[in-house]
């Protein structure tokens, strides 16, 4: 999440939030695509008794049970790859957090899956912001997130989902946001 202050007299703070378009997601989409397509072609080769792969000859495999298993895993892998590529295309989870002192609004925007809730656009008055809360949990599944506490609402997550940010980055962004909004920073 990159924070950049824009507009005259630093009255607008806009933080971009990276969604599904992270390098690790591109890597996994390519790997799963290659693996799923390879298994699918190997299963089809054993059924059709024609070699469809460039790297090995799987047409000699028995269709039952090896070919069926390859076909099943290939279909599952290909469907997972399609899901990953569509998530990347739609940039699910991407968006921005905008804190605007000119209009007195907090705006949280995220992209979702196509349908009724494709655009997730939340607005609150700036004076309803009570605090910036940092949540840090270490261990096997570490969690480092920033939340905005809003009056009479649940805490709103501000950071990206996925790989946790460094503790210093979390502190800096939390302190910058708390300073900009002139509210306390909790949890550190």
Curated annotation (Swiss-Prot):
It is found in: Cellular thylakoid membrane. GO terms for cellular component: photosystem I; plasma membrane-derived thylakoid membrane. It is a multi-pass membrane protein. Keywords: Membrane, Photosynthesis, Thylakoid, Transmembrane, Transmembrane helix. The keyword Ribosomal protein does not apply. Disulfide bonds: none annotated. The keyword Phosphoprotein does not apply. Its main location: membrane. One of its GO terms (biological process) is photosynthesis. The chain crosses the membrane at residues 26-46, 70-90. Belongs to the Ycf4 family. Seems to be required for the assembly of the photosystem I complex. PANTHER family: PHOTOSYSTEM I ASSEMBLY PROTEIN YCF4, PTHR33288. This is Photosystem I assembly protein Ycf4. It comes from Microcystis aeruginosa (strain NIES-843 / IAM M-2473). The gene is ycf4.
């Amino acid at each position: 999440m990159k924070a950049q202050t824009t507009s005259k007299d630093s009255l607008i703070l806009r933080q971009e939030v990276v969604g599904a378009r992270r390098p690790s997601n591109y890597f996994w989409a390519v790997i799963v695509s290659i693996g799923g397509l390879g298994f699918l072609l190997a299963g089809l080769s054993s059924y059709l008794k024609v070699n469809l792969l460039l790297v090995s000859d799987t047409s000699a495999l028995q269709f039952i049970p090896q070919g069926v298993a390859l076909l099943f895993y290939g279909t599952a892998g290909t469907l997972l790859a399609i899901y990953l590529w569509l998530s990347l295309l739609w940039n699910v989870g991407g968006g921005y957090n905008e804190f605007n002192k000119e209009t007195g609004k907090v705006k949280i925007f995220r992209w979702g899956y196509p349908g009724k809730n494709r655009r997730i656009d939340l607005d609150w008055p700036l004076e309803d912001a009570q605090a910036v809360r940092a949540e840090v949990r270490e261990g096997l599944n570490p969690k480092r997130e920033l939340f905005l506490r809003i009056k009479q609402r649940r805490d709103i997550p501000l950071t990206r989902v996925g790989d946790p940010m460094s503790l210093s980055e979390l502190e800096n962004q939390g302190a910058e946001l708390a300073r900009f909004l002139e509210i306390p920073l909790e949890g550190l």
